[in-house]
């Protein structure tokens, strides 16, 4: 699994002209699922996201987690995170998991994240054409990959 976490002042996702989810301060997370991903990958990412300390403390040091600041999370499915561009200029998404693998893992990630956060997590709609709007805060943008745990 691969995610891009962006610390945001606010974010929303619109589908067919209607806002599906919106958050205030927190994280916008783009989530890509690979064929070999499992529930263990979900658990690792949830622990990392919840524990990540990228919100400022009283000394303006990034020392607080999403739990510490009681913020919100919006999760958007993003198969293009697994783009391969080795050959030519048109990306290939062969590494991205098919729906029967990616949808259950996306839903599991959102549910476990919501359970850990103690409140609902905003979501997009898997496979839909979405318009995502955000105000990047910082900017703080972090990538995580369960197959490259750095």
Predicted regions and their residues:
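N-terminal, polar/charged subdomain of small-to-medium soluble alpha/beta proteins
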Residues: 1-89, 97, 104-150
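Glycine-rich, phosphate-binding/catalytic loops in enzymes
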Residues: 93
